[in-house]
Amino acid sequence: GRYEEAYRYARQPNPLASICGRVCGHPCETDCRRGKLDAPISIRALKRFLTERHGPESRNPVTVYPGRTPGILRQERVAVIGAGPAGLSAAHDLALLGYPVTMFDTAPVPGGMMYLGIPEYRLPRDVLKAQVREILDLGVTLRLNSRLGRDFSLQSLRAEGFKAILLAIGLHQSRKLRVEGEDLDGVISGIDFLLNINLGYRFSIGKKVVVIGGGNVAIDVARSALREEQRSAAEQVAMKELMDVSRSALRMGARDVHLMCLESREEMPAFANEIDEGLEEGLKIHPSLGSKRFIGSQGRLTGIETIRCSSVFDAQHRFNPTFEPGSEAVLDCDTAILAIGQASDLSFLSPEDGVQATRQGTLSIDPDTFMTTAPGVFAAGDIAFGPRLIINAVADGKKAAEQIDRYVRGPEWRPRTRLVQISILDHHQMPESYDTYSRLPVPIVPLDRRTGIAEVEVGYSEPEAQQEARRCLQCWINTIFDGNEEEGTECILCGGCVDVCPEDCLQLLRVSEGSMMIKDETICIRCGLCAERCPVHTITMEAFETFDEADIRPELAEVTRD
């Protein structure tokens, strides 16, 4: 029931906690140790529960940083170009550090692709606006409808006196499928489709719509030679776009919406809940199907010639699709929407800027400092790393803000100091039945209410949130085996800890010079029975907590990276 404290824990490291509570790809849940036992904690849904009670969109918002008054403490001006997740995150942290920050965006609204690319039924606009307002209230100046390369340039910003510039412009171009007939009327990009819907424009898409996904995203990722986690994030972003476009088409009145992609159902990224919800809403899925060409009459799309895909990846998991000759068929449609990923628009660059691009269409940066090839010009988010999740962009923005602060301060800069506090817990007890609870599915509205912009997820109730939170294994608490002969806590090899362990994760082995304790951390449930059973206190349960030095020395708050 300590909801305010829990909210601050969730919000302080994440300026977009309310947004992430609704649309985050939750990579943290992949790493959750509870998932090794049954299913991970529903971290995203619990974050939403907390922000609905105490976030900026709630009726009872709480102060995120008690005792800290935001204000301009430094003279050096910083320009942040792009009001998406990376730009907002960086502006937030720079403002807390006392910098006068001006944020520019080409769109008429802030939020980047969170506003332009995510349907309102997934991310209510009042939540997004409240989160942005909270950041602007720190003293950040916002200039909308301002396009880099058209309304201003990097050189003009330098002339205005900006000491540092952060490029966080994201990826707003749609990728091309590069097949015959792609220029027909009725073939549109997924990004343009979502952008127009989210800005309030309406247009006819006909009664039968085919949404095409996959393919190009995979090959672009493979060519970029990204690490596995980056490739996974790019695939997740592409699948989100694919599902958002498909379900939005249904909400626009199309009677027949088909989703086709090269991947088999088993190979589709793991958003099974969204796929199931789409099927309930009437979406028809055609896995393992490729687009050979678009067919038209008098310049207008009438259908797609498809071909069956037998495999997408080779044995090394490289994108290398193979197709079945003779499996061609025609799928009639009024509109085809290409949801095959995002690309950069680097038309703003000029030789005088000194900013270089990579072969993949991103900006070349130093991965440690986030600085581009131009001194004082930094880059973060998708424009620097390619398509990734919102939470990755948030992290990029925070890292970029820290490096900008380091660049501006020069020799006076001090790194953030993290302190560790270790506490021995006597008679540690976990919540009752914590190890027996199953993961609770996030509640959604009934099918007949999934219309227009009505939000599909409704979030946990208080009892549901408490039950889900009780499943946490409290990984900051660990069993410590550290006997000391002088203190009388040396292990006496009684084996009691092994006997009481309910998960059989302990083994006591004899070796030539003594004994050895082996513990399987992957199945330990932190019950503490081994520590309770140990007659000489060789085993203790100890909590490890980290915090900023500024939390105990307020005079350092100005230079702390929150």
Sequence positions of predicted segments:
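Beta1-alpha1 glycine-rich phosphate/pyrophosphate-binding loop at the start
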Residues: 1, 5-10, 14, 40-44, ...
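Iron-sulfur cluster-binding cysteine motifs and their immediate structural context
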Residues: 1, 21-50, 102, 109, ...
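Glycine/serine-rich phosphate-binding loop and adjoining beta1-alpha1 elements at the start
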Residues: 3-70, 136, 144, 155-196, ...
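Glycine-rich dinucleotide-binding loop and its adjacent helix/turn
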Residues: 50-71, 130-150, 174-251, 357-373
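Feature captures the FAD/FMN-dependent oxidoreductase FAD-binding
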Residues: 72-81, 129-180, 293-305, 310-313, ...
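FAD-site-proximal beta/loop scaffold in flavoenzymes
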Residues: 185-209, 215, 294, 314-387
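A conserved FAD-binding loop/helix module that cradles the flavin
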Residues: 232-238, 242, 380-411
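Mid-to-C-terminal Rossmann-like scaffold of FAD/NAD(P)H-dependent oxidoreductases
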Residues: 276, 280, 290-300, 312, ...
